[in-house]
Amino acid sequence: MSWMFKRDPVWKYLQTVQYGVHGNFPRLSYPTFFPRFEFQDVIPPDDFLTSDEEVDSVLFGSLRGHVVGLRYYTGVVNNNEMVALQRDPNNPYDKNAIKVNNVNGNQVGHLKKELAGALAYIMDNKLAQIEGVVPFGANNAFTMPLHMTFWGKEENRKAVSDQLKKHGFKLGPAPKTLGFNLESGWGSGRAGPSYSMPVHAAVQMTTEQLKTEFDKLFEDLKEDDKTHEMEPAEAIETPLLPHQKQALAWMVSRENSKELPPFWEQRNDLYYNTITNFSEKDRPENVHGGILADDMGLGKTLTAIAVILTNFHDGRPLPIERVKKNLLKKEYNVNDDSMKLGGNNTSEKADGLSKDASRCSEQPSISDIKEKSKFRMSELSSSRPKRRKTAVQYIESSDSEEIETSELPQKMKGKLKNVQSETKGRAKAGSSKVIEDVAFACALTSSVPTTKKKMLKKGACAVEGSKKTDVEERPRTTLIICPLSVLSNWIDQFGQHIKSDVHLNFYVYYGPDRIREPALLSKQDIVLTTYNILTHDYGTKGDSPLHSIRWLRVILDEGHAIRNPNAQQTKAVLDLESERRWVLTGTPIQNSLKDLWSLLSFLKLKPFIDREWWHRTIQRPVTMGDEGGLRRLQSLIKNITLRRTKTSKIKGKPVLELPERKVFIQHITLSDEERKIYQSVKNEGRATIGRYFNEGTVLAHYADVLGLLLRLRQICCHTYLLTNAVSSNGPSGNDTPEELRKKLIRKMKLILSSGSDEECAICLDSLTVPVITHCAHVFCKPCICQVIQNEQPHAKCPLCRNDIHEDNLLECPPEELARDSEKKSDMEWTSSSKINALMHALTDLRKKNPNIKSLVVSQFTTFLSLIEIPLKASGFVFTRLDGSMAQKKRVESIQCFQNTEAGSPTIMLLSLKAGGVGLNLSAASRVFLMDPAWNPAAEDQCFDRCHRLGQKQEVIITKFIVKDSVEENMLKIQNKKRELAAGAFGTKKPNADEMKQAKINEIRTLIDL
């Protein structure tokens, strides 16, 4: 039998639907006939240092100099205070001028002209990071001494030394002191930095000690005074569990706190920062917020909703209106094709649903909508989100993130009127366009009841006003920012947990016609939006409405999304104005300690708003194994973070009494034909890579190594996945420009068309506009362009350190990927050893208990498409969730799967990447992992989607691993990663040579060299 990938109109998704985290570069959604790929973890992300992290990992030495011009500037410093050096190239008197600033950014003075002449070249070419401390003489009138340390990459040491020699300066040995007192905690009675402490007295901790300390880092959070419980506001209907009451009490106390921030203390009339020794007269702003880092599945969303309703101003609950029960609610008849409020008028069934599952897509419903405003946006969504079993859905359309709303499967008790035609009928003359955002907002917040009949007050009118909100009014609105994938979950959670007669002004800021009036948005109780919308508005000309408002509270869901400080998304978040700030994340540190800085900067924790002070006082000392740095980190984390895991105990009982989770490995033996193909590809690849080892060029050919590993992993799943089109021969010096281009494009197609979850080694996120360098490494275009810009004029590849140039970056034309996919679409389908094992397990499970639901997970989305065929043939009802699906289809798929009625899907085909964020799939109690991931944390995140709050059955996970294959070797690497995970943030970062050697050893392990 022949088969094809054919689901939606081909070019519907080839568009700039979402903006990635890098500003104006769009994240493309490729046509659905492209091989399905969502990139993650082909390269283990922990193994690579980004350019800014690597830049100051080696201490070159120290230099004494002087700060002059003190009488001309208002900035002051204390003895032993850290200062920052800043280039001032536009200085009219000296193009080499270098400012000396205190922690507040106020200029204290400048370097003497001769010294500035030597250092300007080093700073401009980013050869070293130069850091200063004023050891004494802070009260001098004209000049003060400055002790400077030089940090950089080992390869730049000689260039720095030569530049200084040219100007008559010479670096001294590593200083006898570090410029901060390791014994000084942030609550001590003396200033932090002190030159009295010899550097050799610093305690260098072993990897094992650091691992133990990091294990304790979050454990200690459970043992202190965060055990007080608090009942939520009366408007909350769902009873809180004890750990949620504790979190509520802690969050309310943080929001109302009058304490000084960590590392600050008052001495007479001054406020001292004890780690930089900076002081000022103005009291530093309190940190009204923190990080709620509870494990996934412990109900952080409900806790956040409780905080919003419980703690408004002056410790009082949010003032709310009650809806009278005798209000009449109109219900109208909906014609079959009446509900298309935005996007394309398609009537297709859910992407990936089998025929039997189509019952999940019934007629959508929406309540009556009235226009009451003179604004083009007719009405804010000003009623409580409706309690429902189903979620609002969205569809991506051709020119922007347009939205379609509908209800999912339910037996409709009433009938609704054709909203579209009615809206048109009432619209002003000359405005016949349906206003999607009006219908969308109201659809989110009012719909036909699914259980009880509930009376909803129809909304407040939009009030005309100026763009600026009244500065004298105390802010009212909470802004919630989340990934698109969990937008519908927030709406559902508000509907589920708030009492039926409570009226909230709730607006979903999303879609092409969203209200952009700050005066109107600031009148809401809650505004909900996505990171992409926030970033898009931030990058457009004119003021972003969300940045024109001072919010009462900003909540970041999946807050680790801002971990990349260079991303436009992070900058957009950090620029928001708010009284209170919260980060919700189960993984505050994902890859390294540097992930924390953006979160601390978002919380406005002075002096860490400036990355330099975080790096100098905590990040670098901790990563170099310094005990004092670790102690500061522990104090900081303990102050601003609350974390409980599923194994945490409250009053002797587990926080969450979940059923047991068991993991089994089922070994698969390849058939003779599969083994023959596997061995042939392996032998050919080993010969080529062995030659690279002998020549010492293995990392220069890293794309070839990745290609071989991908092909071996694909054969383990299904030989159909094998990509033969790519030659393993790397670029040679004899290639013409056109031959080189073709070879590089072929290499990139190998990675992109594999259906794997590839990540960029710079930002550790999914590839955004992938490009390949002449040294055959694939990165996000905005990421690698930023590296090139930062390292001008001598930019080097972050992976192999070869020279790279922006002009030589190559993008893969989408039509080439399409052609490759079309060539394969008519092939005959055959099974594989893994598919046989899966089908045997599923069939056996159905015989024992036909109601048990299963997740079938793979990184290769093309493999999921292959699995669909035997599932259909065997009569299984299944649905699918992967990153290529529009949000509407995703929500529909999840709701169908979570439905417990007879005939609902018992299997979900899930891509590993799509299963990693914010989903609740607790209906499933069986997981079949078809192929191992490089990063075990990615697997664990996926497993947590079903092993979470609401799970009533024992969860059994089966990993299919092919015997005598690259998959068994991947398990060895996974185990190493698990062992290092707890201590990874505290262990000393490897230098470039150590990192390369570790990578080489890993390659040897994987291909048995």
Curated annotation (Swiss-Prot):
Residues 925-1009 are annotated as: Interaction with SP1 and SP3. There is a cross-link at K112, K211 (Glycyl lysine isopeptide (Lys-Gly) (interchain with G-Cter in SUMO2)). One of its GO terms (cellular component) is nuclear matrix. Residues 435-606 form the Helicase ATP-binding domain. Residues 348-359 have a biased composition (Basic and acidic residues). It comes from the Eukaryota. GO terms for biological process: chromatin organization; DNA repair; mRNA transcription by RNA polymerase II; positive regulation of transcription by RNA polymerase II; protein ubiquitination; regulation of neurogenesis. It is found in: Cytoplasm; Nucleus; Nucleus, Nucleolus; Nucleus, Nucleoplasm. Keywords: Activator, ATP-binding, Chromatin regulator, Cytoplasm, DNA-binding, Helicase, Hydrolase, Isopeptide bond, Metal-binding, Methylation, Multifunctional enzyme, Nucleotide-binding, Nucleus, Phosphoprotein, Transcription, Transferase, Ubl conjugation, Ubl conjugation pathway, Zinc, Zinc-finger. The modification Phosphotyrosine is found at Y195. The modification Phosphoserine is found at S397, S398, S400. Coiled coil: none annotated. The keyword Nucleotide-binding applies. The modification Omega-N-methylarginine is found at R27. Expressed in brain, heart, kidney, liver, lung, pancreas, placenta and skeletal muscle. Residues 38-287 bind DNA. Residues 837-996 form the Helicase C-terminal domain. It catalyses: S-ubiquitinyl-[E2 ubiquitin-conjugating enzyme]-L-cysteine + [acceptor protein]-L-lysine = [E2 ubiquitin-conjugating enzyme]-L-cysteine + N(6)-ubiquitinyl-[acceptor protein]-L-lysine. Residues 336-365 are annotated as: Disordered. Pfam families: Helicase_C, HIRAN, SNF2-rel_dom, zf-C3HC4_2. Has both helicase and E3 ubiquitin ligase activities. Possesses intrinsic ATP-dependent nucleosome-remodeling activity; This activity may be required for transcriptional activation or repression of specific target promoters. These may include the SERPINE1 and HIV-1 promoters and the SV40 enhancer, to which this protein can bind directly. Plays a role in error-free postreplication repair (PRR) of damaged DNA and maintains genomic stability through acting as a ubiquitin ligase for 'Lys-63'-linked polyubiquitination of chromatin-bound PCNA. Subject to frequent epigenetic inactivation by promoter methylation in colon cancer. Interacts with SP1 and SP3 independently of DNA; the interaction with these transcriptional factors may be required for basal transcription of target genes. Interacts with EGR1; the interaction requires prior binding to DNA and represses c-Rel via a DNA looping mechanism. Interacts with GATA4. Interacts with PCNA; the interaction promotes polyubiquitination of PCNA through association with the UBE2B-RAD18 and UBE2V2-UBE2N ubiquitin ligase complexes. Interacts with RAD18, SHPRH, UBE2V2 and UBE2N. Belongs to the SNF2/RAD54 helicase family. RAD16 subfamily. This is Helicase-like transcription factor. It comes from Homo sapiens (Human).
